[in-house]
Amino acid sequence: MKKKGGRKILGFMVKEEKEENRGSVEFQVFSFTNKIRRLASHLELHKKDFSSERGLRRLLGKRRRLLAYLAKKNRVRYKKLIGQLNIREQ
């Protein structure tokens, strides 16, 4: 992982980000995953921040629904994406 502006960014998505459509399911899942990881690290420090915890749950649900859609439409792209992002399969 590379650091850019204080944030960790996955190297394989940085170069693809410029070429790929930002509205694609893969890009949206990647974006949600970055936000989820940032919120999770925030909640480790601030355990009583319940509004951020609620936001984290909402993001997890959105990502789960997008992954379910991708798994239904194109299983190969789904497997590749979860492998690259290092997240569990549903």
From Swiss-Prot:
Biological process terms in GO annotation: translation
GO molecular function, one term: structural constituent of ribosome
UniProt keyword terms in alphabetical order: Chloroplast, Plastid, Ribonucleoprotein, Ribosomal protein
Subcellular location(s) per record: Plastid, Chloroplast
InterPro entries recorded: Ribosomal_uS15, Ribosomal_uS15_bac-type, uS15_NS1_RNA-bd_sf
UniProt cross-references to PROSITE patterns, sorted A to Z: RIBOSOMAL_S15
Recorded superkingdom: Eukaryota
Broad class of where this protein is predominantly found: plastid
GO terms for cellular component: chloroplast; ribonucleoprotein complex; ribosome
Cross-referenced PANTHER family: RIBOSOMAL PROTEIN S15, BACTERIAL AND ORGANELLAR, SMALL RIBOSOMAL SUBUNIT PROTEIN US15M
Quaternary context: Part of the 30S ribosomal subunit.
Family: Belongs to the universal ribosomal protein uS15 family.
Name this polypeptide is given: Small ribosomal subunit protein uS15c
Gene that specifies this protein: rps15-A
